[in-house]
Amino acid sequence: IKIKTDGYIGYIVKKKFASKFKATHKVSVLKANTYKKPIIKTKQQKKLTFNSKILAKERNGLFIKFENCWIKTKDLKPINYKYKNIFSKIKIFKEVKYKWGGKSFNGLDCSALLQIFYNFNNRFCPRDTLEQRKFFKKKIKLKNINRNDLIFWKGHVAIALSKNTLVHAYGPLKKVVIMNIFKTIKRIENTAKLKVIGVRRI
């Protein structure tokens, strides 16, 4: 199979492969509970992560049915919904653990944090930092950094929340954190011996 959002090619057991469907909604919260019935007390262990896609089959009050489960309508957005500010909800991932290769509430890495918000807005973004740095072509100087700009190191990326703060899935702290931009640059230079190699405007 080929992953649409990444372009990666891999293999999956055929019987576990879902038939093609046209999604109608996507999860807009960090993790959404599912229910056996459209009743709160029937909550299941299964949860859906941010940007999971579903095909709605039925609506019942405050719930929508998909497959053999129900999910709260308030945890969903229509499939074509886009945030005006692409990273406006990025803080929902604050404190989520760092996990290399992860892309969910169970853990994610720095490049995934960037990619999933692009994917939520129905836009393509490469999976790896090297390709992301090439993909975003508008170069700016660090002194001109502002909200939503991207800061790249070798193998790492952070997203500016303002002129002074950034958010990133940071391996050494093992979680998604909000930090001062210039203290972070100094810290990474001192600990990992890495300098900023690019700043991009999306």
Protein language model annotation of sequence segments:
Residues 13, 72-74, 109, 178-183:
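Helix N-cap / beta->alpha transition motif
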Residues 48-54, 145-148:
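Loop/turn positions that initiate beta-strands
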Residues 90, 102-121, 125-126:
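Active-site nucleophilic cysteine motif
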Residues 189-202:
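Low-complexity, Gly/Ser/Thr/Pro-rich intrinsically disordered linker/tail segments
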Residues 34-44, 133-142:
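Short alpha-helix capping/helix-loop boundary micro-motifs
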